[in-house]
Amino acid sequence: CPCGLCGEELFMKPTEEKTRSNPSDLPVYLFKQGNNCEAYRYFGAHIEQRAGETGVVFRVWAPHATAISVVGDFNSWKPGSHPMRKVDNDSVWELFIPGMKEYDVYKYCVTTRAGDLVYKADPYAFHAETRPSNGSKVYDLNGFVWHDEAWQNAQKKTDVINGPMNIYEMHAGSWRMKEGGLPYNYSELADELIPYITEMGYTHVELLPVMEYPFDGSWGYQVTGYFAPTSRYGTPKDLMAFVDKMHEAGIGVIMDWVPAHFPKDQFGLYNFDGEACYEDPNPKRGEHKEWGTMVFDFGRSEVQSFLISSALYWLEQYH
């Protein structure tokens, strides 16, 4: 793990015997301690094989839910047809669905303690539908071929903290448009941007938030997908291509990450299982009244794992 905190030598001993019989115990244990720095590798939707069948395993944290099912086009969005089970007799739910594949759309149908059904996007999804739809999409991050080894090696020999920097901050959706007013996708944007950045002498480009968000008119500061680049400009691998091209051109990439608050959109983190999970349950601390947004419960271990994992995810997966 890039944070250096999740090392086996630090955290294996308390659950050593349990993890021999059930390997999933360790990521759940670390998650609940606030020390799972790569929670996205366990939670969310992951393509894998079980008993010779390829499918997708779904895992989600919902401590107050009485039932959860995975719904999507594959089951006509019918609640209860694919029920999840608890993996820890407490708050983490799991289901493997054979036959599901990349780009399949899904949500979690959560039954609250009040008996209501709420349909939620996956907090750990890597990809999402483009507005106005807001479902999550199964996505495989593997397979992108990076070409930025020279950049990575140069960074190891450079004083990146004290060295000179000249940063160009920009909004990906409005910096420059195609004919007809359509935005460039991530990869195309790099091709347009590199000559300008080079000519103007900038060392880095800083993107206003590109994590998934609901409102086109915003700059992206109310995030609904902390592990998903917004699909307005393409797929996760398109964003990888953007970073790769920038690095090949000798340009660093800085991403604007927003843990300060999150919106109240019903498909998002807000009251995820009918009650406060990600937000502070104290109304005096849990809401930005002036923004109409929620504040994370920074003292909750599971939220700490979520946010630390998000920050490190972008560094690890997008270089």
Language model segments and positions:
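Short, low-complexity, charge-dense intrinsically disordered segments
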Residues: 1-6
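The feature marks proteins involved in alpha-glucan
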Residues: 11-53, 85-169, 174-181, 188
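Structural beta-strand segments of beta-rich domains
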Residues: 54-58
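Short proline/glycine-enriched turn/loop motifs at strand-loop junctions of beta-rich domains
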Residues: 61-68
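Short beta-strand elements bearing conserved aromatic residues within extracellular beta-rich modules
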Residues: 68-70, 106
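Substrate-binding/active-site clefts of carbohydrate-active enzymes
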Residues: 149-162, 171-319
